[in-house]
Amino acid sequence: MSTRCAIGLKRENGEVAAIYCHNDGYPEGVGAILGRWYRNAEKVEALLKLGSISSLGAKLEPEAGAEHAFFNRQQDVTYAYHRDRKDPETSATVYPSVKSYSENARKDFWADFLYLFDNGKWLVFGSNGDWVEIKTEK
């Protein structure tokens, strides 16, 4: 069974851009990877440019010249539907505010968890309806 999630970035204008992630969306999976490996807005923007992803890895790009395919994935590399499986390209969904993201992204993405990179910190939308900071080892 997949644990789906949405990964979002709050931009300076208050909008939230978000993508879908199909696997390991729980805080100990995607949450831990985001907190450890995606620590600045530039890297999060690069992740969002991939569009929808099957799985999140510590690395965004596969090694040059090495195969990275659905049944032969490089270890710790993000697997993107368009780039790696040649599915139609998808772009990030943009919400006008964090409130809109909180209220709509779960149903839009069929997501169990929502993540948000806001002002240098990763947050997860908790089951109590609040954003909670993800604490990870550095």
PLM regions and their residue ranges:
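Short, extreme N-terminal segment that most often corresponds to the first beta-strand
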Residues: 1-26
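Extracellular/luminal recognition modules and glycoprotein regions
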Residues: 3, 25-34, 77-78
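Low-complexity intrinsically disordered segments
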Residues: 35-138
